[in-house]
Curated annotation (Swiss-Prot):
InterPro entries, per database record: Alkaline_phosphatase_core_sf (IPR017850), DeoB (IPR010045), Metalloenzyme (IPR006124), Phosphopentomutase_DeoB_cap_sf (IPR024052)
GO cellular component, one term: cytosol
Sequence positions that bind Mn(2+) 2: D283, H288, H336
Protein name: Phosphopentomutase
GO biological process, any: nucleotide metabolic process
Amino acid sequence: MVERVILIVLDSVGAGEMPDADKYGDKGSDTIGNISKAVGGLKLPDMVKMGLGNISGIKGVDKVQYPIGAFGKLKEMSKGKDTVTGHWEMSGVILEEPLNTYPNGFPKDIIDEFEKKIGRKVIGNKVASGTEIIKELGDEHIKTGCPIVYTSADSVFQVAAHEEIIPLDELYKICKVAREMLVDDRTVGRVIARPFVGKNSNYTRTSNRRDFALDPFNKTMLEYIKENKSNVMCVGKIEDIFNKKGVTEAVHIKNNMDGVDKTLEYMKTDKKGLIFTNLVDFDMLYGHRNDPKGYAKALEEFDGRINEIKTNMKDYDVLMITADHGCDPTTESTDHSREYIPFIAYGKDIKGGADIKIRDSFSDIGKTILDLLQVENNLVGKSFKDIIMK
């Protein structure tokens, strides 16, 4: 009997363009396949053994005759291609309308109100890469003390500040002000604190980022599990994505490997329920920066930890590895891409070689997890428990 699911989201590790990718400017995007082509092949032996290369239409990864895990891929039903939309959908919340984006920066009324409430002028207010904007405006920020506000193709309001100019506590308070403002017809998916350090135009972002999300619009997989008196243990930015709704405990992480370490720490306890992990380096450090070599290395590093994860699994555990969207580092765009997400599952009770094929919605993951944990629910989605269980 399954009593715990370990769900690991490899942030942005897409498995090829979705049929509507052209509507999002993402025709030809294929995060895994194009990275593999760019670096002369990916070496992911443990995910390959589980069936990664057996997923229908996946490119650049070896197929095996007898996978030890279940495998497949899922379509995004929601309108959008960002972190919040992807994680919410896999947890049972489908967005009929995309969250607001601000391709020309934020309107004057929003900025004026924000400046008044925080007692500081802001600089920036445009679409920008986070690493580029601190290079461009970091010196001015240090001279003036004005926080840097910027956005991207996603539904985000980002505030960058030097940790010695605006201390972390104050930066987080500033972001909470923005979060309270950006609702209703101004809604953004996330307000993100982006602290950095350094001097003289040589700045680097720190791992003290914080995401301030919205409450999910409907009840999620997490809330159903928590209400069932079970544990929802979140690693990385998961608790921020769900605005703590349905979370019983959480830990933030410094990088992917720290995320694996923290996941293992939860696995070594006897706590039943869900361990929900997001590993963001793929997206943040390599996808958005169009660095296929760095991305490939990060994938190979993660694959190198899978044996350790498997060794620490209990008989009642099921491991699931998936993604939330794409972010193909080989295309001109530095933004997310509208892609299928891969899915592999492993455990004592999982049928090796089980193919879930192409599912109609990420929400099938959440529905299946609740089914495995025997939690009654009204979640959208279709469970594939019967396909993957022995």
